[in-house]
A protein has these predicted regions:
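Gly/Thr-rich phosphate-binding beta-strand-loop-beta motif of the actin/hexokinase/Hsp70
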Residues: 1-19, 101, 133
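Short glycine-rich, Thr/Ser-proximal phosphate-binding strand/loop in the N-terminal lobe
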Residues: 11-36
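Short, basic/hydrophobic alpha-helical segments
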Residues: 34-52
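Acidic, metal-coordinating catalytic cores used for nucleic-acid/nucleotide bond scission
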Residues: 54-63
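Short alpha-helix plus adjacent loop in nuclease-associated cores
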Residues: 76-128, 132, 167-170, 261-271
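Phosphate-backbone recognition surface of nucleic-acid-processing proteins
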Residues: 93, 214-217, 223, 227-307, ...
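Glycine-rich, often acidic, oxyanion-interacting loops/wings at catalytic, nucleic-acid
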Residues: 128-214, 340-341
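Basic, amphipathic alpha-helical segments enriched in Lys/Arg and hydrophobic/aromatic residues
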Residues: 301-351
């Protein structure tokens, strides 16, 4: 078998390889644009050589992952933070990175991570695309609100009613401002049907998955949040306890404690930003419609600050959804979920 450590870049890859049977070692740089990398791996496939490739989790590598899967080669994806922690030398070059990856694979210390399936990744694009379009629509609506306010019209949400739209179009504006209004309204009209189509598609995908429907029984959690949660988390078996969910999503505070003094900073913001956003939004919706969540939110907001309370409730929601999914149970107001629910000595999940 040939073991290859790949330091991947968008335009090229630096590799270090070892053939176990012969002990042959080598290093090589392969370009992507001229097909050099693809020809190299296809040649290995034609020669019947078994290959295992290790690389850090990175972007812009989908084509490379598909190529290796097509050729039947084994691909290991590693956690960049853990790989960096295993570095001994102070030098950091592309060659050193490739050598480090190869050494970790040989010594069976390579920190492999879970990799979503192609279907999972494609469905994530659906959720992401809708989210980005909604953000674009919000920016367009804010610009139209600004145009109206500059003319002394503060209609807020009424601007999007049929009457508000008519009044906006009647405003006497200067030539370029009038053109801006017209083109923004045209963009808005084109985006609404697209967002509706994507929303319907996401709702249909949610109905196909029992675990998504189960998470939707929680107050404030709709099909988009539940679907995104299932797609991004992948499987609850990846995590030992609920606290790891908060760490994975990036909803825990960073810490720089020393000398017996605890110093907590802003949230780490590691992990998927879309899921982090959706959890915080869903937690606010739950606080509006559920008395228990409202009391907890108000309690936290009075102790600290509203922004901190929102993030804390988002983390709590992420933990609750994890245990609902892992234990296969629907939401129940009489059941409290903690970070160690279901473990020995904590049967009811209270913490």
């Amino acid at each position: 078998m040939m073991i290859i450590g790949v330091d991947y870049h968008p335009s090229f890859q630096q590799m270090a390889f070892l053939i176990e049977e012969t002990g042959e070692y080598g290093e090589r740089e392969l370009k992507h644009s001229d097909g050099e990398a693809e020809r190299f791996y296809r040649d290995l496939h034609q020669r019947g050589i078994r290959v295992r490739v290790g690389m850090e989790a990175t972007g812009y590598s989908r084509w490379f992952e598909r190529l290796l899967a097509q050729l039947g080669f084994e691909l290991w994806i590693g956690d960049p933070a853990e790989i960096e922690a295993k570095r001994v030398k102070k030098r950091k070059t592309d060659r050193e990175d490739a050598r480090l990856l190869l050494r970790l694979m040989r010594e069976e210390r390579f920190p492999r991570i879970w990799v979503p399936s192609p279907e999972n990744r494609d469905l994530r694009q659906l959720v992401w695309h809708r989210h980005r379009l909604v953000q674009m629509r919000t920016r367009i609506m804010n610009q139209l609100q600004a145009l109206a306010m500059n003319e002394g019209k503060q209609w807020k949400s009424k601007l999007w009613s049929e009457r508000g739209r008519t009044e906006l179009e009647k405003l006497a504006l200067a030539p370029w401002a009038s053109r801006r209004r017209q083109e923004l309204l045209e963009l808005l009209d084109r985006m609404d049907p697209n967002i509706e189509e994507l929303t319907t598609a996401a709702q249909q995908e949610a109905k196909k998955r029992p675990e998504v429907l189960r998470l939707m029984t929680h107050p404030g959690v709709g099909p988009l949040t539940a679907l995104a949660y299932v797609l991004i988390i992948g499987t609850p078996d990846r995590f030992h306890c609920g606290k790891q969910i908060g760490t994975y999503v990036g909803l825990i505070p960073s810490e720089a404690s020393s000398g017996g003094k605890q110093r907590l900073g802003h949230i780490s913001r590691q992990g998927n930003s879309l899921l982090r956003y959706l959890l915080v939004e869903a937690a606010q919706a739950a606080a509006r419609i559920n008395p228990t969540w409202r009391r907890r939110y108000i309690h936290l907001a009075m102790r600290r600050h509203k922004s901190i309370a929102k993030v804390a409730m988002g983390r709590r929601l992420g933990v609750r959804l994890y245990w609902m999914w892992r234990n296969g149970c629907d939401y129940s107001p009489s059941l409290e979920f903690g970070s160690y629910v279901g473990q020995l000595g904590n049967g009811h999940g209270g913490k």
